[in-house]
Amino acid sequence: MADCIFCRIAAGTAKAEIVHETPAALAFLDAHPAARGHAMVIPRVHAASLLELEGAAVEGLFLAVKEVMAKVAAALRPAGMNVGWNHGRAAGQHVLHLHVHVLPRYAEGGRGVQRLGEGGDRGALAEVADALRRA
């Protein structure tokens, strides 16, 4: 997709600090890192979300995520890592090409994933669980 910056990075027509490549995916350092070594792993095919990827592409993407995590662990020795992605603009996805963040966390600056709420109402949880099971 010509107007997608991540597709241009994958095609080699836009610059990025590429740190890992596979036939299915590639990883590069985030241009606006939240921590030293913050990388993003993308599928080579354009997909705005995980729901758009076929099985083999999903497998290739997450194998690359694991390999990037191993590289980050070996090279930078963080105390931990956050790994995840934003799905859709309402969730904070700014580039509509699926990208998985590998975010090293260091003892002096790690915040982890912040808790979003308190315990849920058991009845409401059961209702949502039933709806998900039926879907």
Regions found by a protein language model. Give the residues of each.
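HIT superfamily nucleotide-processing domains
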Residues: 1-135
